[in-house]
Amino acid sequence: MISIIIQILLISVSVAMDAFAVSIGKGLTVSRVRVQDAVKSTLWFGGFQMLFPILGYFAASTFSKYVTQFDHWIIFALLVFIGGNMVHEAFEEDEENSKETAQFDWKHMLPLAVACSIDAFAVGVSLAFMFTKAHMAFAILSIGVVTGLFSAAGLHIGRAFGSRWQKPAQIAGGVVLILLGIKVLLEHLGVIAF
């Protein structure tokens, strides 16, 4: 049980890194972080990070009887792809984001929340094969809460420290997802046991 909780928390932190990085970027452009802006950021990112794994879970559940014999390969491929993409994106410079002023209305937050949650959809697919329904509910709640907290913290960190933490956070999140994907594959192949 402790192992499952640790896995869920690691997944939650990893999935939250995109929203954290975007929030740091938004924090760079504000003179001060208003409470209502932190709440909006928390609700947008946390809410979408909860919604997309649910959608991924239901998509996977619908087709699970067809893919259970190779689900570990799906989990491995998705987590390694998502993690690798996060690491790759960390090394790409996005000059548009650095020049954009932080706005928190729905026209600005909706595309960011969706973009940051695409990975969470794929993680939801993976979670459908990894956990029971009860564990899945805890995972979805954990992903939403952790993402919300990280996005609020990202605003403050971006405001206080600048862009120094944006790239390392995204790289760390990507590496953790890659390692989790490798762990799932090695467990299924009987190389390791947890």
Swiss-Prot record:
InterPro entries xrefs: Mntp/YtaF (IPR003810), Put_MntP (IPR022929)
Chief place of localization: membrane
Keyword Ion transport: yes
Gene Ontology molecular function: any one: manganese ion transmembrane transporter activity
Subcellular location: Cell membrane
Keyword annotations from UniProtKB, A to Z: Cell membrane, Ion transport, Manganese, Membrane, Transmembrane, Transmembrane helix, Transport
Residues passing through the membrane, by range: 2-22, 43-63, 67-87, 111-131, 137-157, 174-194
A GO cellular component entry from the record: plasma membrane
Membrane disposition: Multi-pass membrane protein
Family statement drawn from the similarity comment of this UniProt entry: Belongs to the MntP (TC 9.B.29) family.
Xref: HAMAP family: MntP_pump
Protein's job: Probably functions as a manganese efflux pump.
This protein's name: Putative manganese efflux pump MntP
Taxonomic source organism: Bifidobacterium longum (strain NCC 2705)
Gene coding for it: mntP
